[in-house]
């Protein structure tokens, strides 16, 4: 394994930073009163202001035109299919250099769960690809990942949303919760139980459906506010007698769990890059402060206790970064089962969350 950053990856990251500095940052500064004042950013119902949504769309479209928005998507979906290592390092660079910016993450580079050409969409029928993918690729349309429920989070097999076939349609009923981008999405990748017997045995029985969010029977009841804020990005979805055509099944009937993992595992890798970048930014802030703040006639960075704390943080970040690179390398260079990648992903995320803490 050689973790030297390829020249091509460095060029991509530098080009992305130039795009952000020239296109996105000026747009943020021009609209700072809207973007960085919560009472302007959110409406009373917790949803983002329509003007905010318009700005986010403007950035998505510009990123797509510049070639960044789709660069990690599959080639069969119209992306560049750049590898996991480049994806990890790119997310790291964004989080490290542009922390907590309103129009950057996950807008310039979309989340594998929601916006952009997520690998889950490989399972779409060709007719649906022809109809929907162009708008998604261009950043004009966004998605949400309808898996989590009130009683089913990490335990995917605990979902209760059911789909019953009636003639050539599936009638779906249930509730989804903590669904990122649900209040704003144009489409939903919706997971439901289609075979209760297989589902009970945890051997299948879950199917993924492609749904337009303006369909009758699909309702976003409320936005779930982020702690300390007046609104949020996630929502609660009620599904009542939602009728979905047979051809809107993503992938194979009863095999939706595998499709879910396609999005989740990619998402874990991207999240790890964000955790590492955020931790690197936080460490720099700590070092800068330690070199500035003085007690007992010298900077606190000269006190051994503070040095130990900073050193331990640096070691955690170093370990997490190498764990993430190792995982990305294995995904890029070896063939592994979904279960093996799932285990790698969990270990990876644990290490990176520890680094952030």
Can you name each region flagged by the protein language model?
Residues 214-245:
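Flexible, small-/acidic-enriched active-site or ligand-binding loops
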Residues 122-124, 164, 190-194, 210-212, ...:
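Short beta-strand-to-turn element immediately C-terminal to the catalytic PLP-Schiff-base lysine
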Residues 132, 159, 175-177, 221-225:
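Short beta-alpha junctions and helix-cap segments that line functional grooves
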Residues 1-102, 107-111, 123-128, 135-140, ...:
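Alpha-helical interface subdomain recognition
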């Amino acid at each position: 394994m050689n973790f030297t950053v390829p020249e091509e990856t460095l060029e991509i990251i530098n080009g992305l930073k130039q795009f952000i500095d020239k296109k996105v940052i000026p747009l943020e500064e021009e609209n700072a009163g809207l973007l960085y004042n919560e009472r302007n950013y959110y409406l009373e119902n917790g949803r983002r202001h329509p003007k905010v949504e318009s700005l986010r769309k403007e950035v998505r479209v510009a990123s797509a035109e510049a070639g960044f928005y789709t660069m990690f998507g599959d080639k069969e979906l119209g992306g560049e299919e750049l590898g996991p290592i480049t994806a990890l390092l790119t997310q790291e660079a964004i989080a490290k250099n542009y922390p907590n910016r309103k129009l950057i993450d996950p807008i310039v580079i979309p989340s594998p769960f929601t916006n952009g050409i997520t690998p889950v969409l490989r399972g779409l029928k060709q007719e649906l690809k022809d109809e929907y993918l162009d708008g998604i690729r261009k950043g004009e349309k966004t998605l949400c990942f309808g898996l989590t429920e009130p009683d089913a989070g990490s335990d995917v097999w605990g979902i209760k949303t059911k789909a019953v076939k009636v003639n050539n349609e599936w009638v779906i009923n249930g509730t989804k919760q903590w669904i990122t981008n649900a209040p704003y999405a144009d489409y939903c990748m919706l997971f439901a139980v289609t075979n209760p017997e297989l589902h009970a045995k945890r051997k299948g029985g879950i199917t993924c459906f492609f749904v337009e969010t303006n369909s009758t029977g699909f309702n976003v009841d409320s936005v779930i506010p982020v702690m300390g804020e007046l609104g949020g990005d996630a929502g609660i979805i009620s599904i009542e007698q939602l009728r979905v055509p047979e051809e809107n099944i993503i992938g194979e009937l009863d095999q939706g769990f595998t499709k879910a993992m396609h999005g989740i595992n990619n998402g874990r890798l991207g999240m790890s890059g964000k955790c590492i970048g955020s931790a690197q930014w936080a460490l720099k802030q700590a070092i800068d402060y330690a070199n500035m703040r003085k007690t007992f006639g010298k900077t606190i960075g000269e006190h051994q206790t503070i040095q130990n704390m900073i050193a331990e943080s640096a070691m955690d970040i170093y370990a997490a970064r190498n764990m993430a690179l190792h995982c990305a390398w294995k995904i890029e260079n070896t063939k592994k089962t979904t279960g093996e990648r799932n285990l790698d992903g969990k270990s990876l995320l644990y290490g990176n969350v520890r680094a952030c803490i």
